[in-house]
């Protein structure tokens, strides 16, 4: 299931290894009884403890050759569960730091009997650096990351040039990176950064149509009715 660290763990070392700035703030969320029960009963089965060793993803899911997709920051996990249910041929690794969201997704894993989904409750940058092998991912989902809309907080944004280079090192040739946001200025920021990465190419002229596999969230549906926009940005690894 795991092997000693190899490969390109030092991508963006100057900017990432000593990173005092994180893209998230841990908040003390309240757990429901159902979420706590799911954490107690299902985290030992579907959770992957953080450790600085490279995962053998085929062994982790018990099958070889299936496409592997990483989702960073899955929130309460509703979209994650729906995507995993609709694509049983793919295996999904969800990374999230907030305990209520982890409990919520575990609850859905149990209800839907999903065997193609695993959870790592840890900082995504450290997971990428120390647990994901180079050229091992077929896709990466980053849906509605915190836009940190105040200019003085832009340094906290997840999508930065060094982070994108790290992602590219973990993606296979032909793998896709899909970012979705409902904050237009952040969409422009993401598009600009991804366009500057020489290892990525845009699958559209600018923003992409929403793929069928990404479900509409309740929040997104409410925003659409109010005339708010959502921007999907999909690039492919060269």
UniProtKB/Swiss-Prot annotation:
The record ties this protein, via Pfam families, to: Methyltransf_4
Tell me which InterPro entries the record gives.
SAM-dependent_MTases_sf, tRNA_(Gua-N-7)_MeTrfase_Trmb, tRNA_methyltr_TrmB_bact
List the pathway annotation.
Answer: tRNA modification; N(7)-methylguanine-tRNA biosynthesis
Catalysed reactions, semicolon-separated = guanosine(46) in tRNA + S-adenosyl-L-methionine = N(7)-methylguanosine(46) in tRNA + S-adenosyl-L-homocysteine
Whether Methyltransferase counts among this entry's keywords is yes
Q: Which residues form the active site?
A: 146
| SUPFAM superfamilies in alphabetical order | S-adenosyl-L-methionine-dependent methyltransferases (SSF53335)
User: What does the record give as EC number?
Assistant: 2.1.1.33
Q: Name one GO cellular component term.
A: tRNA methyltransferase complex
Q: Which UniProt keywords apply?
A: Methyltransferase, S-adenosyl-L-methionine, Transferase, tRNA processing
Which GO molecular function annotation, any one, does this entry have?
Answer: tRNA (guanine(46)-N7)-methyltransferase activity
Q: Where does S-adenosyl-L-methionine bind?
A: 71, 96, 123, 146
Cross-referenced HAMAP family: tRNA_methyltr_TrmB
The similarity comment for this entry is: Belongs to the class I-like SAM-binding methyltransferase superfamily. TrmB family.
The protein's job, in short, is: Catalyzes the formation of N(7)-methylguanine at position 46 (m7G46) in tRNA.
Name of protein: tRNA (guanine-N(7)-)-methyltransferase
Organism expressing this protein natively: Methylobacillus flagellatus (strain ATCC 51484 / DSM 6875 / VKM B-1610 / KT)
Gene coding for it: trmB
